[in-house]
Regions:
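N-terminal leader/signal peptides at the extreme start of proteins
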Residues: 1-11
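Exported/periplasmic ABC-transporter solute-binding proteins
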Residues: 13-107, 111-121, 126-331
Length: 331
């Protein structure tokens, strides 16, 4: 298994405001799991504007790669207003984040799935140690493109009629199972795209197709693209004659709804979240949606609680706004 490495050092300096140093390091993983670490350290040289010095300390967050982009942005914004707080944000996956929180080795475990109910304090089980905070929601959209100026797609449980904009999940799975992610459906060439990087979005899609692989997330030879944006750009690029592109992205990255496939007739929209969730579960092996969570060992307090409250805030420019900016769905 190839471990991806990313190193980025960005320094911004001002005599009047806090200096933010962001260091991104990809760490060789244990047990085949890649962990991306971002250390966001704030060093104050002076104060400008309304800075909150009432909370201080260090926060170590690890877990879901779906929540990771939000956590990085939220941490950066929070520290700009709270210069006495340093935040370390890591990936590693939901299971990793939950387990580390259970063992009290981190301050916040990030997850795009719920922990076992017997481990959650609010469920009332003896011996439970995790305090659960529901952060937001995620919806994964199947996207398709045949190059036509007007398109309408619908994923069904067992019927394929490409001429009518329909494709069955069985045919989608067949394409993703092909050695190169390309197969023929009703005399059309269907080319699949997936994520080249580790992604909770891909993990969700892989489970829905029942093509999940312990190392690669999605057990497919489909062409890999970097990030939601990379998959979106690849699928929406003009396809060759008699070719259809197919892929998947988080809802927030759908820039034109004509490419987003319905699920058994249910639209992939934030307003239609519940019905889309039910339909995707009926069509596939699991849902193409999930809630997003923060887990702490016991009830959060101090800087950890202040940061969580910032993430839950629907004030302009705060947590729930940031959540939508990175392609997720607010509470």
């Amino acid at each position: 298994m190839t471990t991806k490495k990313l190193l980025n050092d960005i320094t911004a300096t001002s005599p009047a405001i806090a200096t933010l140093v962001l260091i991104v390091i990809a760490v060789v993983a244990a047990a085949g799991v890649g962990v991306i670490v971002m250390n966001i350290q704030t060093q104050t040289e002076g104060q400008a504007g309304a800075k909150d010095l009432s909370v201080s300390g260090e926060i170590d967050m690890q877990g879901s790669t779906t929540v990771l982009p939000f956590a990085l942005e939220a941490a950066k914004d929070f520290m700009e207003d709270h210069p006495s707080v340093d935040i370390l944000v890591s990936g590693g996956g939901s299971t990793h984040g939950i387990n580390m929180a259970i063992e009290n080795k981190i301050d916040i475990g990030m997850a795009s799935k719920q922990a076992d109910v017997e481990d959650i304090l609010q469920q009332g089980y003896a011996g439970a140690v995790l305090y659960e905070t529901e952060l937001g929601k995620r919806l994964v959209a199947v996207i398709m493109n045949d190059g036509a100026s007007s398109q309408s797609w619908n994923v069904t449980a067992n019927t394929t009629s490409l001429a009518n904009g329909q494709i069955s999940i069985a045919d989608i799975k067949t394409v993703y199972e092909a050695a190169d992610g390309v197969d023929t459906v009703e005399n059309k060439t269907v080319k699949a795209f997936q994520r080249a990087d580790s992604s909770g979005t891909e993990e969700c899609f892989a489970a829905w197709l029942n093509l999940k692989d312990s190392e690669k997330q999605l057990d497919s030879g489909a062409q890999g693209e970097v990030g939601n944006a990379g998959v979106w750009n690849a699928v929406t690029a003009t396809p060759a004659t008699d070719t259809i592109h197919i892929g998947f992205v988080d809802l927030g990255f759908v820039e034109d709804s004509k490419y987003a496939a319905d699920m058994n007739g249910e639209e992939a929209t934030a307003a239609n979240y519940d019905d889309y969730e039910t339909a995707s579960d009926d069509v596939g092996s699991s849902k193409l949606t999930s809630k997003l969570y923060f887990y702490t060992y016991g009830v959060p307090s101090g800087a950890v609680d202040a940061f969580i409250q910032f993430c839950l805030s629907d004030a302009t420019g705060e947590g729930q706004d940031i959540l939508e900016e990175v392609g997720l769905i607010a509470l």
